[in-house]
């Protein structure tokens, strides 16, 4: 018998912050307690949360620097104490916070002699420097130092190939991970005749996000990963899964799957799956957000022609959306508007 509803556990988890402190501008710490778990559950959640915190929380970094009249990363600039390579390393360590997913530009334009710090960076309104005292370079002579910076938001890290540098543009190795460390511990306690567990989660950040914000973002990332499994109780989907492995693979690769999923999406199948799962480039993602297309269900209200009408949403962005929908959900958006009744 197939259940039409997923049973909800009577177990009610509660969490609270038991300790929080700011050790420095670039080191924030909080300790959270979550309970009660049944025996064995706390460790499962702890492992998943640690991985999500370290790998799924986004950060903002300087990813490229343009120097005028400089041809090589290991060049020296007359009147600058550091080599270009050393300046790039210092720029990569600057901690930023941004509310925008668009690629941003920032500038350094100073007259020496002067000690150059993060405070000297001219930023767009959506970007904030966490520690303005971070060191960049020392200008020892009365010369101008002009650097144009590219700022991006992403997750993980990006190690650039120095060969890609050209015309004074030098990539910066970017670490987009605002979480410096995560620890968890599990403690058992007796509740009547039942053994339950409490999970303690310790989070250290670089100050660009608070530990509480990081906990929220990591939790949302995990929820998004598991939402597709919640819809496996759909009868038309479950019946298909009763076939052999080979039949399943044939079914999933066939055009009929698109029609099946289109039927499912007429209801609430994708109502709670956010477009974050499509992993779209920043331009396409932000354009969809601006028109309040927050979920896959919202996006399915658009045809290809509708997407083309969105401001700054070009043909390339449409192709990126179509490719992501097909790859992740085997969905094809119609060319023209379809009306569901």
Curated annotation (Swiss-Prot):
Q: Does the keyword Transport apply?
A: no
Where in the cell?
Plastid, Chloroplast
- Locate the region Alpha N-terminal domain (alpha-NTD): 1-233
| Alphabetic keyword roster | Chloroplast, DNA-directed RNA polymerase, Nucleotidyltransferase, Plastid, Transcription, Transferase
| Chief location bin | plastid
Q: Which domain of life is it from?
A: Eukaryota
List the GO cellular component terms. chloroplast; DNA-directed RNA polymerase complex; mitochondrion
Q: Which reaction does it catalyse?
A: RNA(n) + a ribonucleoside 5'-triphosphate = RNA(n+1) + diphosphate
Documented EC number(s):
2.7.7.6
Region (Alpha C-terminal domain (alpha-CTD)) location: 265-341
A GO BP annotation: DNA-templated transcription
| Single GO MF annotation | protein dimerization activity
Q: Which InterPro entries match?
A: DNA-dir_RNA_pol_insert (IPR011262), DNA-dir_RNA_pol_RpoA/D/Rpb3 (IPR011263), DNA-dir_RpoA (IPR011773), RBP11-like (IPR036603), RNAP_asu_C (IPR011260), RNApol_insert_sf (IPR036643)
Query: In the UniProt entry, what is the domain comment?
Result: The N-terminal domain is essential for RNAP assembly and basal transcription, whereas the C-terminal domain is involved in interaction with transcriptional regulators and with upstream promoter elements.
Could you tell me which HAMAP family the record lists for this protein? Answer: RNApol_bact_RpoA
- What is the annotated quaternary arrangement, including any partners? In plastids the minimal PEP RNA polymerase catalytic core is composed of four subunits: alpha, beta, beta', and beta''. When a (nuclear-encoded) sigma factor is associated with the core the holoenzyme is formed, which can initiate transcription.
Q: What does this protein do?
A: DNA-dependent RNA polymerase catalyzes the transcription of DNA into RNA using the four ribonucleoside triphosphates as substrates.
Q: Which family does it belong to?
A: Belongs to the RNA polymerase alpha chain family.
In Swiss-Prot or TrEMBL terms, this protein is called DNA-directed RNA polymerase subunit alpha
């Amino acid at each position: 018998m197939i259940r039409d509803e997923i049973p909800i556990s009577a177990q009610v988890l509660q969490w609270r912050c038991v300790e929080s402190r700011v050790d420095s501008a670039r080191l924030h710490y909080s300790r959270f307690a979550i309970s009660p778990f049944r025996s064995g559950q706390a460790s499962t959640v702890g492992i998943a949360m640690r991985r999500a915190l370290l790998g799924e929380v986004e950060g903002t970094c300087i990813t490229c620097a343009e120097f005028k009249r400089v041809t090589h990363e290991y060049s020296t600039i007359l009147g600058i104490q550091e080599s270009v390579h050393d300046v790039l390393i210092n720029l990569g360590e600057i901690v930023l916070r941004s509310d925008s997913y668009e690629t941003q530009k920032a500038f350094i334009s100073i007259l020496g002699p002067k000690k150059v710090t993060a405070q000297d960076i001219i930023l767009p309104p959506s970007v904030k420097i966490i520690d303005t005292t971070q060191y960049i370079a020392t200008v020892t002579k009365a010369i101008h130092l002009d650097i144009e910076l590219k700022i991006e938001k992403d997750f993980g890290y990006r190690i650039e190939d120095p060969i890609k540098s050209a015309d004074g543009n030098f990539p910066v190795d970017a670490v987009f991970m605002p979480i410096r460390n995560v620890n968890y511990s599990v403690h058992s306690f007796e509740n009547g005749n039942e053994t339950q567990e409490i999970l303690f989660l310790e989070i250290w950040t670089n100050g660009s996000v608070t530990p509480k914000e990081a906990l929220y973002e990591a939790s949302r990332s995990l929820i998004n990963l598991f939402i597709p499994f919640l819809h496996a109780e759909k009868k038309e989907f479950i019946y298909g899964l009763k076939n052999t492995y080979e039949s399943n693979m044939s079914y999933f690769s066939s055009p009929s799957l698109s029609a099946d999923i289109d039927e499912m999406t007429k209801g609430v199948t994708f109502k709670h799956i956010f477009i974050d799962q499509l992993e779209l480039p920043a331009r396409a993602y932000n354009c969809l957000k601006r028109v309040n297309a927050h979920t896959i269900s919202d996006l399915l209200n658009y045809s290809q022609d509708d997407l083309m009408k969105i401001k700054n949403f070009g043909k390339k962005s449409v192709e990126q959306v179509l490719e992501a929908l097909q790859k992740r959900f085997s969905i094809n958006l119609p060319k023209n508007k379809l009306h569901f009744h």
